[in-house]
From Swiss-Prot:
It comes from the Bacteria. This is Sugar fermentation stimulation protein homolog. The gene is sfsA. Pfam families: SfsA (PF03749), SfsA_N (PF17746). InterPro entries: SfsA (IPR005224), SfsA_C (IPR040452), SfsA_N (IPR041465). One of its GO terms (molecular function) is DNA binding. Belongs to the SfsA family. Gene3D superfamilies: 2.40.50.580, 3.40.1350.60.
Length: 249
């Protein structure tokens, strides 16, 4: 079975000089040229901002863009000095998970899906947008609509992928609203784990204990958790399957 899930043009390699002003990163390419790349991940990126780390960036010739380069991946040193590439472009997570849905990799967990809608307005104040709203096929035994929230997950401790890596009021609100659509609809949280060197997923209690409490409340109320793991390469991404939940360490 071919576990490649997405192919793309080979990325350009270089080393990280620095990330600054949240959105910007200076990269020294292998040919010696220094470029400024957009950094879509504005969080602390724990363990991923080591100066001199190998990185991969993409190029766009679109005249509408302020920056032609985008920082996509960074190499980190894992257990036993294993080199691991981590996907850091948070805007890519939804594309990955949509591909997983379209390839029916979630069929055993969600059943047959008829339609996929993106960025649908929902919530008590109608000011939030759910990443994906799925409508099941008539043949699906559970005919409830499925609300899916995707969380790009890069932080790792002790073989556990953790989200969030900082306090997130927005993430807290998402959990409250996911809980609110139940039981009339099904709510699903999908951590998009963009590194292969993990065995479990857990809430980032150390970074945001309130999120951790809300996460547990939502799970107890029936929210489905589907942590999806991926391995990043220079010109493709491979599917590494699901990771089980691990709480408290």
């Amino acid at each position: 079975m071919d576990d490649r899930i997405i192919n793309f043009e080979p990325l350009i390699e270089g080393v990280l000089i620095k990330r600054y002003k949240r959105f910007l990163s200076d990269i020294k390419l292998d040919n010696g040229e220094i470029v400024t790349a957009h950094c879509a991940n504005t969080g602390p990126m724990k363990g991923l901002l080591n100066e001199g780390a190998k990185v991969r960036i993409s190029y766009s010739s679109s005249p509408k863009r302020k920056l032609s380069w985008t920082w996509e991946q960074v190499e980190v040193t894992g257990i036993n000095n294993e080199k691991v590439w981590v996907g850091i472009n948070t805007l890519f997570a939804n594309k990955l998970i949509k591909t997983v849905i379209e390839k029916n990799l979630l069929k055993d967990k969600l059943g047959d899906i008829a339609t996929i809608q993106s960025e649908v307005v929902y919530g008590q104040d109608k000011k939030s947008r759910i990443d994906f709203l799925l409508t099941p096929k008539i043949s699906n035994p559970d005919n409830r609509k499925i609300f899916i929230e995707v969380k790009n997950t890069t932080w790792k401790k002790n073989k556990i992928a953790l989200f969030p890596d900082t306090e997130t009021k927005r993430g807290q609100k998402h959990l409250i609203e996911l809980k609110g659509v139940m039981p009339e609809s099904k709510s699903v949280l999908v951590p998009c784990i963009t590194r292969k060197d993990v065995d479990f997923f857990g809430p980032g209690d150390e970074a945001d204990p309130i999120y951790g409490d809300l996460f547990r409340d939502s799970i107890d109320a029936g929210m489905l958790l589907i942590p999806c793991c991926f391995e990043f390469h220079k010109d493709h991404i491979t599917w590494k399957g699901f990771k089980p939940l691990k709480l408290d360490g």
